UniProtKB/Swiss-Prot annotation:
Organism: African swine fever virus (isolate Tick/South Africa/Pretoriuskop Pr4/1996)
Superkingdom of origin: Viruses
Family statement: Belongs to the asfivirus polyprotein pp62 family.
Statement: the UniProt record of this protein carries the keyword Cytoplasm: no
Entry keyword annotation includes Ubl conjugation: yes
Feature type site, description Cleavage: 158-159, 463-464
Induction line: Expressed in the late phase of the viral replicative cycle.
Keywords from the named record: Disulfide bond, Host cytoplasm, Late protein, Ubl conjugation, Virion
Name of the featured protein: Polyprotein pp62
GO cellular component, one term: host cell perinuclear region of cytoplasm
């Protein structure tokens, strides 16, 4: 009996026959879904690198401490279009990286690209099932471009993307900063995927730098809550669309006014400084603030031993998912119990204190659970946005609308959409998520690092994976984008490369810039620019 397929339902089946090692790498990098035609409206084409040198480079980077280069190279080999013959290699096409492919020459059975000078021929032995829009090409020489002008596919049916909302009432100093950042992000994503400057990263670093320099007790309070995704950090710290209540994480008097932050940019190398904040989680030397009740000094465990915190969190996670009654009634109640213990006693499984007293006081009355569900949802939406082959304003607008109208932070318990037991009651029939899908998302949330979140030092990212329950097999494919992987968040973060020449120390420069911004002392600014 023949052992090889003659027709293929998947590109991965063809790879299994031709290069199982490369298929294993793609699978280990969680990129198999990128080869599925179901992911793309226009089918998918895979460029197989015939050159052993390219495949060896992919392997070397894939199994290194930073697999981002392997991911980027593989993305350059995936085209979100069905291109079966050279005749279809026309118009606005590009790779999954978003880089436009410029064709220099097409022949009867060959395509030569300008950028990268790749020579491509259709794979003679790849024949997809008739209903599958799949194609495989062989790259005989050259390479696929990793950088270059972006491509923009025309939309079918006409019309423009809904714009990112730019107006909201009431219009506060917090919303003003958020709207400015959202507009800047939309603009730079259209230009270069924010590869040069990420506005969310810049503002998050600037706010944290301001707190570190001017309000160290506030800095200590918020540091355990920061997230590797600067977009998430920005919204959780600023809370720009909250209109009810005065329980802001950072008070108005600190953010605004003559001595406030006021949105000032305070950074020299945003990405490096942002990562540095995570290393401070285990290197705090000024945690000598006595507990207000006992008058004793307790160094919060989120600072002194974050690994143990995550170990106890894993115990809670395992207990919930391996409980003898994992269902839509028991499971959400167990999640709420875990958060109630943390909010009321500052412990996880009676181990604590987890957070500084000021932090836990700011997270009571459902705010901690609301924050972590917020992380989970925004991570998923942001990851979906960044995984698209082309940037669409409508996708980003959906994130903004979710933050403004569904999760502004006005009523924490009522804004819980996944974790609230009320969502699974017999009488609860409203909402736009089917009960099984909602429960699958709850299981994914429990399995994510967003569950009972505490910021983890950068050197710990990419460690042991969370133990999962067999229930995760129930998660529909379209919901896998909600799973939170720190490495993918770091990949988004590493798109930003913001550096300037350091003349003075970062702290000194930041203090001077803030002084100039709010006093108009332009002579000092001239000196800094020399």
């Amino acid at each position: 009996m023949p052992s090889n397929m003659k027709q293929f339902c998947k590109i991965s089946v063809w790879l299994q026959q031709h290069d199982p090692d490369l298929l294993e790498i793609i699978n280990n990098l969680c990129m198999l879904g990128n080869l599925s035609a179901a992911k793309y409206k226009h089918g998918v084409t895979f460029i197989y690198p015939k050159q052993a040198k390219i495949r060896d480079e992919i392997k070397k980077h894939a199994y290194s401490n930073d697999p981002s280069q392997a991911i980027k190279t593989l993305e350059s080999l995936i085209l979100p279009f069905y291109i079966p013959t050279p005749a279809e290699f026309t118009g606005e096409i590009g790779s999954y990286t978003g880089v436009k492919l410029e064709v220099e020459k097409t022949e009867a059975n060959k395509v030569i690209l300008k950028n990268g000078e790749a020579v491509l021929v259709p794979a003679a032995d790849f024949k997809p099932f008739p209903d599958r829009r799949l194609a495989v090409w062989i790259m005989e020489s050259g390479s696929m471009p990793l950088e270059g002008p972006p491509y923009k596919r025309k939309k079918e049916g006409g019309g423009n993307d809904p714009p990112v909302p730019k107006h909201i009432s009431p219009y506060t100093p917090r919303t003003r900063i958020a709207i400015e950042v959202e507009k800047a992000f939309d603009d730079c994503m259209r230009q270069n995927w924010c590869s040069v400057n990420n506005p969310y990263l810049a503002k998050s670093v600037s706010l944290l730098s301001f707190l570190s320099l001017n309000h160290p007790t506030e800095f200590i309070k918020v540091l355990p809550l920061i997230d590797f995704d600067p977009l998430v950090t920005f919204y959780l710290l600023l809370e720009p669309y909250k209109t009810h209540g005065d329980d802001f994480l950072i008070p108005e008097t600190i953010l605004f006014g003559p001595t406030g932050w006021n949105g000032t940019d305070l950074y020299q190398s945003a990405m490096l400084e942002f990562k540095k904040f995570f290393t401070q989680i285990t290197r705090q030397t000024f945690m000598d603030i006595a507990d207000s009740a006992t008058k004793e000094v307790d160094v919060p465990i989120c600072y002194s031993d974050p690994e143990t915190v995550h170990s106890y969190t894993n115990h809670v996670r395992t207990e919930i998912l391996h409980h003898n009654a994992v269902n839509k009634v028991t499971t959400p109640n167990l999640v709420v119990q875990a958060y109630n213990e943390l909010e009321q006693t500052n412990t996880i499984r009676h181990y604590g204190p987890i957070f500084p007293e000021s932090t836990i006081n700011a997270l009571r009355f459902w705010k901690k659970l609301w924050q972590d569900e917020q992380r989970f949802v925004i991570h998923g939406l942001h990851r979906t946005l960044m995984d698209q082959p082309t940037y669409e304003t409508s996708e980003f607008a959906e994130i903004v609308r979710n933050l403004r109208f569904s999760r502004p932070g006005n009523n924490y318990i009522n804004e819980l959409n996944i974790t609230s037991p009320a969502m699974y009651g017999d009488k609860h029939t409203t909402g736009d998520i089917a009960p099984n899908d909602r429960f699958a998302m709850l299981v994914a949330f429990i399995n994510s690092t967003d569950f009972l979140y505490t910021a983890i030092p950068e050197e710990k990212v990419g460690g042991n994976e969370t133990q999962t329950s067999s229930l995760t097999d129930l998660v529909p494919t379209r919901l896998h984008s909600f799973l939170n992987h720190n490495l993918s968040k770091l990949k988004i973060l590493n798109r930003a490369q913001q550096t300037v020449r350091n003349i003075l120390s970062n702290d000194c420069l930041n203090q001077l810039k803030h002084y100039v911004k709010h006093t108009g002392k332009n002579e000092i600014l001239k000196i800094l620019q020399e």
